[in-house]
Amino acid sequence: MLIDTDVIIWYMRGNEKARDYLDSNPRFRISVITYMELVQGMRNKQELSALRRALRNWKAEIIYINEEISSKAMFYVEQHYLSHSVHLADALIAATAVSYGLPLLTGNEKHYKIIKDVDVQKFEPK
């Protein structure tokens, strides 16, 4: 399972459903894009340390961008940006899921609905 940025944000904010899911399904994967988005949202070094600790405890694997992911993401942006405003980060995360054959757990289904290749698993924080 590839975990989208929003699910980890919910976890860091103390959301019970996110906590239950991530704590009971360790060894998931995240895109390096997700990691960078999370780091950009940190307000201080303590939050960054908490994120790193959580990822270590979960034994989460960070998937780095390669040529296949880049190529798929470029295709998604070319095909869907003008009509549906597919953003670069979402295209890269979707391409990572597709390239690795992983379902994508996200609460932001609307970000990925136009990309038919992605197996989106809906996360409901409430």
Predicted stretch roles:
Residues 7-8, 34, 69, 92-93, ...:
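Alpha-helix capping/helix-boundary segments
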Residues 8-9, 36-39, 113, 121:
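Nucleotide phosphate-binding site architecture
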Residues 4-5, 38, 73, 97, ...:
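Generic structural signal for small/hydrophobic residues in well-ordered secondary structure
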Residues 61-107:
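Active-site neighborhoods of divalent-metal-dependent phosphate/nucleic-acid chemistry enzymes
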Residues 24, 58, 115-116:
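Short, structured coil segments at secondary-structure junctions
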